Amino acid sequence: MVKTPITEAIAAADTQGRFLS
């Protein structure tokens, strides 16, 4: 998987979403 600002943002939002909920 290539790391790009877009994928990084999605991954960050995904981890935050799981952490918050």
Swiss-Prot record:
Contains one covalently linked bilin chromophore. It is a peripheral membrane protein. GO terms for cellular component: phycobilisome; plasma membrane-derived thylakoid membrane. GO terms for biological process: photosynthesis. It is found in: Cellular thylakoid membrane. Keywords: Antenna complex, Bile pigment, Chromophore, Electron transport, Membrane, Photosynthesis, Phycobilisome, Thylakoid, Transport. It comes from the Bacteria. Belongs to the phycobiliprotein family. Light-harvesting photosynthetic bile pigment-protein from the phycobiliprotein complex (phycobilisome, PBS). Phycocyanin is the major phycobiliprotein in the PBS rod. Heterodimer of an alpha and a beta subunit, which further assembles into trimers and the trimers into hexamers. This is C-phycocyanin alpha subunit. The lineage of its organism: Bacteria, Bacillati, Cyanobacteriota, Cyanophyceae, Nostocales.
